[in-house]
């Protein structure tokens, strides 16, 4: 048994007899009470396919931990399904749920004196929420992603949930029929699991591997794959070794590990939401990570993985050629990763990648060599300038636009912007501004997928969008999000007016409002914040505690 465990102080000895009595009530024997007690934290919900199956995976993880000589007890965390909340008040709870999940795992773990932690997640905020808790707790921990859905098909075209959102815009623009929309809806997401493209959920699953917090190859098998079950069981077994050797999460979650994750994010062209989440996980791990680190790494990292929405393939395709380790190995061989970082296997990243069993199949159609990239620069760029002094984010993997200058069309909410696009208010060449949708303003920094999909679906190919809100990982096109400071706290986006000129310049890493400094200052002096949308309840509480997007939108003590 390891030298130092939490559970003996709670469950061993005469004075802990009442605690042991309760463990006996749930079926634990004397022998099991004497073993390390571990938590299986499971983000489970029937409200959507992403986490519908994770309760079953928890049972498999328990089997693995038992084989490793541990005594597991499982508990659920909440889940907010992003796709179901999209375009409604429900989306304001999405990012909120990330920090709630972290808090829930912390509370359960510490309240019951567990010795180690297996985390199981699926939908977008569950992976970062659980990883934040692991970083905060600094205990032996290992993560396993629940897996993505298989892609759908209609009329010979491969579908993801992105196609349903864009089909709405296409229908409203009379480009497809209502029946075609219905058929796309029925076929786009045919199985349990998360969205099949490299949207936020699959991006964060990939990040769990790149950080060293998940077993190599565990992110890519689909939710319905027998290999998914195998990885879950092996994850449970691996926790035993972490506890035995006293390896805690912060020994893995180092600055170098975060550099590896950012490098992988840039190479794969993953979701912009990963910027927020990696900043948040680093904050909980006590690692100083900034937006400048993302740009520094983006400049040196080529974009090499052709994954939807920026490319052609889905997670199941990547799995067939070897999964995330294929990307990691190319980056390591090019000298772009820290190979000496510790991982949950107890081995280094380099050792894991050398020992991994790669399928003997061609993969260059999905993952290119570093010397023959899709684009020479990473898939995400941080912009700063007079419109975003603290930063903003654009996914260049999903657009070929490197410079865009246009007149502003300003909306004070996502709903107003969606109605504007629907009614034909937005014209080619314009920059749609959506503000008061930031962490404090919305609150909850909702995703603008309904608007971006409407723009794309309507065939408006020369329209940009700038917002202090977020974007779905399924978003494509010249879309800039995470503008900081946000409008609600008096960021310059608050004083943009219809007709102002906005300049997006990726090569110069700039996002500017073409006004003099004096005019910007004068407008800010005249500006006053609107009344908060919520004065009580969870969202009001969240708005009072949340930081800006440039800091990961983490909640901190007031």
UniProtKB/Swiss-Prot annotation:
Keywords: 2Fe-2S, Amino-acid biosynthesis, Branched-chain amino acid biosynthesis, Iron, Iron-sulfur, Lyase, Magnesium, Metal-binding. It catalyses: (2R)-2,3-dihydroxy-3-methylbutanoate = 3-methyl-2-oxobutanoate + H2O; (2R,3R)-2,3-dihydroxy-3-methylpentanoate = (S)-3-methyl-2-oxopentanoate + H2O. Its EC number is 4.2.1.9. Homodimer. PANTHER family: DIHYDROXY-ACID DEHYDRATASE DAD, DIHYDROXY-ACID DEHYDRATASE, MITOCHONDRIAL. Belongs to the IlvD/Edd family. This is Dihydroxy-acid dehydratase.
